[in-house]
């Protein structure tokens, strides 16, 4: 146990070193300040602007920014869906894979456009190298860049500045943040044995004399942006549990840090951009404490093991079901909480095999969406909770609510409410329909409490743009592909539109001078109140579902 806890502690310590450095760099990128990469990247960006016809880098309003996001994402989706549909006749298909069904192609396209990467297929048997490279790999960069661009536009609006230009923000997000880090990390993974080849699957002879086919492909570069962009969609069916995606402990450390580095650093970037690093560190500390607490209770459940198995063996063993021995229970726990907290969705073990405390913690992350949160958008959701907290505390003490020197009024609260309410709606409505008709809408492999968790997790993962799953669910059917596609769209674009309109509303407000009566948001007390609001509004909404799922399952096992 001690060794496992030391591994977790080392990872978190490295993360704390990364946060201020990467956060500062990203602030310079979006504030258009000079960076060390300017001599290389400025010519590249100018070339991209020239090719794309982006001659005027004019500032956009909130609605213009939202339209640009949606229009560009639609075009990307049409392009990728076309590649899937004609996969059988396109190059880079050494295994001659046919095109997937139309509903699987539609679901996969929407899933990757929305930065969710929810997979109802196994990559090595469904999509060709060309589809993985030019369709899925392309969307991994653009969807992550879209999230970062929206977050930066939102922060600019909060402090009264123009929201910026979406196409410029998207380009800079990819060229200055995603590409450099993905390139370096891809080379590191390559050095650890992750393959990068266009050769067809290899046939080998096993020690027993049988012939086995080993799937491979251009994995290393795919894996790096998969983790860095919080995409999470694996090249292989079992994702980062596969030894060709994640061979050893060092690669596991690199991939864990990759999925954590940008969302954690964005909070520091926010502090730099508003000129208040103290508030950024307070917010970071609040999220970090919740994050560590979730790791602790999940680790407790996994270390104690399954009481049914332990009673049968008359000994106490950790729960190793669904885990890779090369990682063990500790690294699987850290990964599970990190991947559901950051909305990455990649897995190095099976979440369906987690003990009830682990299932509770992962669902808790998906419900809140701010324990680091999705690429860019998770940070924006955190600020929405700050606005709600300012409004509520202002009502309680009889002060006019203000945030960053601007009044919070009815219009802002309406937008904030839409952002917070669309998430439970997108999860609970289709989840209830599925549970009412389990025989017709087949796919649930576990009866009882765990079956409830499977269904809710699938829709929560889609609504939160996470993509992981309790993979005991048989989800490659017409119902699951279409219903989760609708949830994916609702969970991605309704909040983005509301966020940008909220930012535009804040931008248009006249700044209010700070007085002795102004509620300060950079204090420990306000941060504690914010944590309470997050738990009340975010967690209690889903308490009945948690009670019917992992909590009931835990009591059944003898908590």
Curated annotation (Swiss-Prot):
Q: Which domain of life is it from?
A: Bacteria
MF terms from GO for this chain are: P-type potassium transmembrane transporter activity; potassium ion binding
Where in or outside the cell it occurs: the entry states: Cell inner membrane
Keyword match Ion transport: yes
Predominant location of this chain?
A: membrane
**Transmembrane region(s):** 2-22, 69-89, 135-155, 177-197, 254-274, 280-300, 327-347, 354-374, 378-398, 413-433, 482-502, 531-551
Q: Which Pfam families match?
A: KdpA
Q: Which UniProt keywords are given for this protein, alphabetically ordered? A: Cell inner membrane, Cell membrane, Ion transport, Membrane, Potassium, Potassium transport, Transmembrane, Transmembrane helix, Transport
Alphabetized InterPro entries for the sequence? KdpA
Stated membrane topology is: Multi-pass membrane protein
GO cellular component terms, alphabetically, are: plasma membrane
- Record's HAMAP family? KdpA (MF_00275)
Q: Which family does it belong to?
A: Belongs to the KdpA family.
Biological role = Part of the high-affinity ATP-driven potassium transport (or Kdp) system, which catalyzes the hydrolysis of ATP coupled with the electrogenic transport of potassium into the cytoplasm. This subunit binds the periplasmic potassium ions and delivers the ions to the membrane domain of KdpB through an intramembrane tunnel.
Describe its assembly: The system is composed of three essential subunits: KdpA, KdpB and KdpC.
Q: What is this protein called?
A: Potassium-transporting ATPase potassium-binding subunit
What organism is recorded for this protein? Rippkaea orientalis (strain PCC 8801 / RF-1)
Q: Which gene encodes it?
A: kdpA
